[in-house]
Amino acid sequence: MTFELRAAFSPCGDQPEAIAKLTQGVRNRTPSQVLLGTTGSGKTFTIANVVANVNRPTLVLAHNKTLAAQLYQEFKEFFPNNAVEYFISYYDYYQPEAYIARNDTYIEKSLLINSEIDKLRLSATRSILERRDTLIVSSVSCIYGIGSPENYTSMALELTVGTEYPRALLASQLVKMHYQASSVPQRSTFRERGSVIDIFPAYESELAIRLEFFNDTLTSIDYSDPLTMMPKESVTSVILYPGSHYVTPEAVREQAIRSIREELEERLAFFQDRPIEQDRLFHRTTHDIEMIKETGFCKGIENYSRHFTNTPPGAPPTCLLDYFPEDFLLVIDESHQTLPQIRAMYRGDFSRKQSLVEYGFRLPSAYDNRPLTYEEARKYFHNVIYVSATPGETELNESQGHIVEQILRPTGIPDPIPEIRPATGQVDDLLEEIRKRLSKSQEKILVISITKKLAEDIAAFLSELDIAAAYLHSGIETAERTRILSDLRLGNIDVLIGVNLLREGLDLPEVSLVAILDADKEGFLRSTSSLIQFCGRAARNVDGKVIFYADHKTLSIEQTLKETERRRHIQLEYNKANNITPKPIIKAIFANPIPQGGKKAVQDTPQKPLSTQELEKLIKKYENLMLQAANAFRFDEAAQYRDKMKAAKEQLLYLS
């Protein structure tokens, strides 16, 4: 299949030129290109056009899952008939294993896996192995810690009508593929009923596979509704992929066990004069070996990944990139933040594991379950497009002049020129500006503070004045962060104060004011790149305004003003030449998509916007009601609960 782009609009402004240049660069095998596009210029739409033109499997990397979710939603709309997949961390909660030597504290790995995201991850790898019209959106931190594609594909099971499959052996094979026998129809399970085997793939929630046999001969294969098991499509063959990325063939598992034991013997000899560490390592590793031998899995199995891939110490680990073919297209979004994250991940992982290995909690091979170094990652950059409004030196140097600018916005809105006001009395002045805008409906204000404490104090001050304000910084727990962002999108918050709001992907057309406090305090979040990015947050509103509160102009402020004026001049000249009047973006705030009405309302659904916690409870409630209805053979009712659960999950995915 080929990528089929669907959009209600056509490329305009400088988008056609950018699309043509980037497409030609990919076709000419240019290793690196930069799309330097202003905020709101339609960079995602441009990339979608390039993907459709070159028709290659594509990986889009974002630096956090908030941005990844936004990109996933957009590409899903552009390519409704293609395999657009989402690959992020499947942990709702994750505490990595660690040992603090100074106070002899061992912290065991603790985690909570999100089943829905696990399904999406498995769906992503299935698609890239089967289809070339696959686009995967991923956060950069989660492409690691995944089993090898060779082991994964070797455990896939191809079933063909007319072939004999001894039923007992087939059931045994399904268990080895991490499917469980169960009478309840849910993901990663199978059930036997007479001459029928129903399989519920780990990567599907809308389809089940029904196999019908005569003795041991497979007579039919149907894709069926997982609740009613009514057939949707009959096929002559199907490939069933494993229920986990960590499955391994038995021969590989046996070889890995031998290799682990050899390393254990070497390490026990190393700890000869340290009996505590020696005993600890022996018992922990021996227990893991027994678990792998009996079940094919153990807690922390990723720490033995080198033994399963049979690679030498220090070799690059397998990752999501290995699942892609050689000619894939790599798009690195917000590259000025994503590339530094790739560089930093290896160092952070190594320092955490150092004490675990040194004190006998892990074998040295645990070091090889790690992120790629930047040099290792670059070997995958055969065809890469860096996307950023402010690309860094790395991207500019690696692109060797292949830089495509996209300055014009489809809306015709020019870059706002920052207004500089004194930092003295900045909070009082800010309050006056906020009150002006709150008299207009649906306008929002972003405030950038220099410290977490100042963000909290300003939020408290505004709240006392009955202004709907909230603060957001790195000290906020993930669940609370999600709630705040959803409240902002749903209109429950008018003013958001933060230290680094760039990472949140807040591109809201309702934002009419961006105020940067203490803009003259030169540093990371007051650099030219950051200031330009902050200004872009107001460039989606016709009346967008940016205020720098500064007592003097720093070099970063001067460079920001110069670049903003350059872009604004180009934008205004184009508007004048083409008789364009700036117009606002039509972009509705995300609403509750849970369906109402229909054939028969099985349960009243709350009309008010739901928080993350409320959605999670609602999903669990619908799941229980769905299973109860299915077990009672009330399949129409169960299907309605399934649809409601799916809609709630989609909203939760968007908000997270």
UniProtKB/Swiss-Prot annotation:
Residues 24-409 form the Helicase ATP-binding domain. ATP binds at G37, T38, T39, G40, S41, G42, K43, T44. The beta-hairpin motif is involved in DNA binding. It is found in: Cytoplasm. Keywords: ATP-binding, Cytoplasm, DNA damage, DNA excision, DNA repair, Excision nuclease, Nucleotide-binding, SOS response. InterPro entries: Helicase/UvrB_N, Helicase_ATP-bd, Helicase_C-like, P-loop_NTPase, UVR_dom, UVR_dom_sf, UvrB, UvrB_inter. Residues 616-651 form the UVR domain. A motif (Beta-hairpin) lies at residues 90-113. It comes from the Bacteria. PROSITE patterns: HELICASE_ATP_BIND_1 (PS51192), HELICASE_CTER (PS51194), UVR (PS50151). Belongs to the UvrB family. This is UvrABC system protein B. Disulfide bonds: none annotated. Signal peptide: none annotated. SMART domains: DEXDc, HELICc. One of its GO terms (cellular component) is excinuclease repair complex. It comes from Chlamydia abortus (strain DSM 27085 / S26/3). One of its GO terms (molecular function) is DNA binding. GO terms for biological process: nucleotide-excision repair; SOS response.
